[in-house]
C-alpha cells in the first residue's frame, strides 16, 4: 500500500508552529489541519491562539471552528475528522500539513488508531453522564474495579481512561495509512518562556479578558472552559485575584504546559527538534520537506 505523505509540525506552545505551517503551505501547495484540541471551538479565538483571519486567508485551515463551546471533543473524533480532511486535501493534489500541540490527538492519528465501526456517540454521551454523577472517590474506585492504571490521577484523566476502556471494542489498531515527516520546533527554555510571557501579554491586549469573561458568564463548566487561557482568569472575575496575579498564573501554567508538551513529544513520539533561533532554521526545514517530497530546489 502506498502511504500518504503528510507533514506534521509539533512543539511547545508559542514556538511558532502556525507561522511555519503557513510558510510550508505556500511553498509546497499545502493546506493546514489544526491538531489542537481547543481550536475546534467557535468563539474562542484569542485564548486558543487560533490562526487569525489574515493567516487563514494565507493558507486553507481545517478543523478550526467545528464545534460549539457547549460540545465535547475527543481524540476519537479528531482522528475521524483528520482522516477526512487528509483525504480531501490529497484528492485535490495538495499536501496535508498538520499543525498542533495536542500530543494524544497526533499520536492517535499517526499510530493508526481509527474507528473500526461507527462509535455510538449517544452511548458515549450517556456513559459520560453516568460518570458525571459519581464522586471523585467513586470514579477512582471504578478505575480499580476495571484494573485501569493512569500515571496522573485526576478526575478528567480518570474519566477519559474509563471511556477508552468502555468503548475499546469499537477501536482497531491498524497499520497507519500515512508516511509522516515530523518537524519538531523548540529552543532554549528561556527563549520559549519569554515567548510565552510575551504572547500572554499580547492576548490580554487583544481581547482575551473579554473572551474569558464571556465564557465564565455563560459556560463556566464546559470542556472548553478548562483549557489553559481561560480558567486562570476566572478567579479575577470573582475578586479572588488581581488581574496581575491572574496573568502571572496564566503565564506559569502555560510554561508548565509547554514542558509537558515537550516531554510527550520526546517520550511518546520520539521527535527530534530544530532550534527556532538557529540562523538557518527556515531553510533547513524547507530543505527537509523538499527532500521528503522528492522535489528539486527551484533555481
Swiss-Prot record:
GO biological process, one term: tRNA modification
Positions annotated to bind ATP: 11-18
EC number: 2.5.1.75
Cofactor or coenzyme needed: Mg(2+)
Binding site for substrate: 13-18
Region (Interaction with substrate tRNA): 36-39
Record key words, sorted: ATP-binding, Magnesium, Nucleotide-binding, Transferase, tRNA processing
Record flagged with keyword Lipoprotein: no
Site (Interaction with substrate tRNA): 102
InterPro entries in the cross-refs: Dimethylallyltransferase (IPR039657), IPT (IPR018022), P-loop_NTPase (IPR027417)
Record GO terms (molecular function): ATP binding; tRNA dimethylallyltransferase activity
Reactions catalysed: adenosine(37) in tRNA + dimethylallyl diphosphate = N(6)-dimethylallyladenosine(37) in tRNA + diphosphate
Enzyme class: transferase
Function of the protein: Catalyzes the transfer of a dimethylallyl group onto the adenine at position 37 in tRNAs that read codons beginning with uridine, leading to the formation of N6-(dimethylallyl)adenosine (i(6)A).
HAMAP family registered for this protein in UniProt: IPP_trans (MF_00185)
Quaternary structure, from the entry: Monomer.
Family of this protein: Belongs to the IPP transferase family.
Protein's UniProt name: tRNA dimethylallyltransferase
Lineage: Bacteria, Bacillati, Bacillota, Bacilli, Lactobacillales
Gene encoding the protein: miaA
